[in-house]
Design a protein with these regions (language model features):
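Short acidic low-complexity segments
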Residues: 50-51, 79-83
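N-terminal Rossmann-like dinucleotide-binding module
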Residues: 1-73
Length: 83
């Protein structure tokens, strides 16, 4: 298993959400609350078999804002946050 850490966010850049949701799958309610409607709609239109990797997972997340970290964790099924 390849373990991936998602580190940081930047304004206007939803890649932490899109990459994490594609790798881990996503929680529909959590992703809907993330504020990234474009990403939410994109992954919802994909077949579930297009989302997730058997040999990789985003296991840890840290961002500059603890509330953002919690939103990303909830949206993308990331088990651990880093302070």
């Amino acid at each position: 298993m390849i373990k991936i850490g998602m580190v940081g966010v930047s304004p206007g850049n939803g890649h932490p959400y899109s990459f994490s949701s594609i790798i881990n799958g996503y929680d529909p309610d959590g992703l809907a609350r993330s504020g990234w409607d474009v990403i939410y709609n994109y992954v919802r239109e994909r077949d579930r078999s297009d989302v997730g990797f058997d040999d990789a997972a985003v296991t840890h997340v840290w961002t500059q804002d603890s509330d953002e970290t919690k939103r990303l964790q909830a949206a993308c099924k990331i088990p651990h946050t880093v302070d």
